[in-house]
Amino acid sequence: MVATSVVQQSSAQRDQRLVLWLDELRLEDVPLVGGKNASLGEMIQQLTPQGVRVPSGFATTSYAYRYFIERTGLDAQLREVLGGFDISDVTELRRRGRKARSLILNATFPDDLKAAILDAYHHMCETAGQNLCFDDESCLADHAYTEVDVAVRSSATAEDLPDASFAGQQETYLNVYGDQAVLIACKKCYASLFTDRAISYRTTKDFDHFEVALSVCIQRMVRSDLATSGVMFSIDTETGFQNAVLITAAYGLGENVVQGSVNPDEYVVFKPTLKSGHAPILSKRLGTKSLRMVYDTTGTELTKNEPVPLSDQARFAIAEDDILQLAHWACTIEDHYTQLRGSYSPMDIEWAKDGLTGELFIVQARPETVQSQKSQTELRSYILEVPDGAEPVAKGRAVGDLIGQGEACVILDISEIGQFRPGEVLVTARTDPDWEPIMKQAGAIVTDQGGRTCHAAIIARELGIPAIVGCDNATQVLTTGEPVTVTCAGGEEGLIYRGELPYRVETTQIDSLPETRTKIMMNVGNPEQAFTLAALPNDGVGLARLEFIIANHIQVHPLALLNFNQLPDGNEKRQIQKLTALYEHKPDYFIDKLAQGVGTLAAAFYPKPVVVRLADFKSNEYAHLLGGSTFEPHEENPMLGWRGASRYYDERYRDGFALECHALKRVRDDMGLTNVILMVPFCRTPDEGRWVLDEMAKHGLVRGENGLQVYVMCELPNNVILADEFSQVFDGFSIGSNDLTQLTLGLDRDSSLVAHLFDERSPGVKRMVKMAIQTAKENNRKIGICGQGPSDYPEFARFLVEQGIDSISLNPDTVVKTRLEIADMEQQMG
């Protein structure tokens, strides 16, 4: 039974009620309770039956806010305070904001509004089965057991609209308990409508201060102080890739993640195959998570931060089951809002895990406001021209894909923001909403702390400003006044260079590019760039290289992981131990990292084909991996030695190849990315091809099973001469024009002495290519090319098209140019 005054209110017109329960609300109630609270009600009503958990609670209405302003006589006073000043004057902005907030905090709640709030709060306590002490001092010491602890959050009526994020502008108060504390928190929320950043933001976005009202949500606390919490997006925040869920997680209450006080863990999940019952966790990145926010049970504050033990920092904050559950909920929420709005609606969601029950909850969900508003027809690429010898002075997590420049301004405390000048690069430990008046004037933003979902990252995306977060030491290595270049154009890692380096911007209208009969595919290797590259017009990936993933993400020789205890003690062994610290069984490190890298490449282009070439390091290159020198022979000419297929079935390496197979099987079977086609490199004979297929089958990669296709690189003269026989072993060919050219012409392409003779357009090479295409066609086998020749020489590309090649795979920077050229060629050919 709802408390008396709440029942009385329900008899009035709904839009004149002072308090509404969340389960009474729907999304159309934004004018009444703001976007945040309307969204909570929508999820409680519509998504609880689908398993999405949202804590219960109630909301004061926008009518209650306006009633408060009117009854207290604040309207005229606030209009006078906020009228006629320049918001770029930070000192004056702070003075006016402080005055406006003081007016609200010193006002008294009308009796009926106070009663409505407290009656609803008491009802929450009763339904929670707890005994109230109603501010009796004798029981204050036992408040954790006598009163419901609640989260008190503000929700502006203009908040969380798809094209205007008000994220973090109004306040949130956690672990609030007792009548007076709830009332004070509500009043503080009202006052937060006039924080400096909120005044500045509304003015910039041309929102009338007095057209915006505020609703307050009083919601049962989720005890994530005893567990974990974080933020997730149902879209990739940097690239706009729509098929990914990004999840961040840290220990304790969620404010540290939102504010950027910690560097959280990050997880990426692929939506399409998640929905079909697979477990496609594409990446897991460990954050430092050095602090956690918990209840302050002994001090005078509601919450406090405490250090996280190193053992907890060194492990992931949530298990894979929780990652997948959260990703499922993100999909459910996104699908619901997309259907509700009639257009694609990616979501920005806050979640928390209750340490008492072990249950996950959604505590907020609002529209994503940056990527969803970007043009889907134009692709803009920033290319930094780094001089030889230039090294980055700091690194962190890139936000967006832009480049910014200017003089650094290192500010360690909010009280110093008056020294910031427009156009400078803001360098600080972290930001919160109080920094927004100067953030929008920055040429770039750099922080020591924070992850991709922290306050600095969210605001930088919205403002279209390049930012790098989580640098750890930027405030120490950068100096106020020195020119710097901040680049987010290279993938997930952002780099800061001293000086203003040259760069260029390339714009492509991707909606106007012509279709071609010849498939135009891409050569890729770096998973960090995959989501960006997938936005280019393409027909899939003709060559996905494992070498980049192994050299940069794994760094360790597979046999060194299998035989770790046999390695000599020394620096390399210590490095391997550090890299694999999360793994009890060290070979699992190789499998995990390779599966995540390949999975990301395959997911980016799904469901288009992604041809993954098995590792093709030469022995000298394998030796450069950590621990590699112990297991690799010295060869005089490794280019023609123990490489490609000959390694996979060899007793000396087959255990290492088994790890590769396990990773690729995980990508196809566990992640559900069956668009992956495998390709065997440097396969000298058809028999060798069969031996490799047998070896793969031992580890669950059976050609033809679950749609698995296996191609072979056509890069040796023998591959061409015996193409009929190779066609009986493999499903397709990819011409490797680099090796085929050097082996047809009998030269070393790495030797400068004969480099002038290397030419794919040589008549002998072209005859080899023509024979390969013709034989593949006769045997009903797919054939493409993945070398550099078609990119460099339009006449060579024309030759390939004339021969009827199925696909041409290009480096990403030549995809658009070559597509236009091939479309023109095909049109001329008729």
Question: Where in this protein do the model-derived segments appear?
Answer:
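Extended active-site and interfacial segments that coordinate phosphate-rich ligands
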Residues: F166-S200, S224-T298, V363-K395, Q441-D448, ...
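Conserved metal-phosphate-binding beta-hairpin within the catalytic cores
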Residues: G168, G342-T369
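N-terminal beta-alpha lobe that positions the nucleotide/phosphoryl donor
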Residues: M1-C217, Q313-A319, L326, E334-Q339, ...
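Acidic, glycine-rich flexible loop/linker segments
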Residues: D75, V370-S372, A394-A398, L402-V425, ...
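Conserved alpha/beta-domain cores
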Residues: Y145-A151, A156-F166, Q170-Y173, E211-S215, ...
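Conserved catalytic alpha/beta cores of large enzymes that bind or transform nucleotide phosphates
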Residues: A244-D348, A352-G355, E391-I403, D413, ...
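Alpha-helix C-terminal capping segments
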Residues: M43-L47, T239, Q441, A457-I465, ...
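Structural motif
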Residues: G51-R53, D149-A151, E171, S215-V216, ...
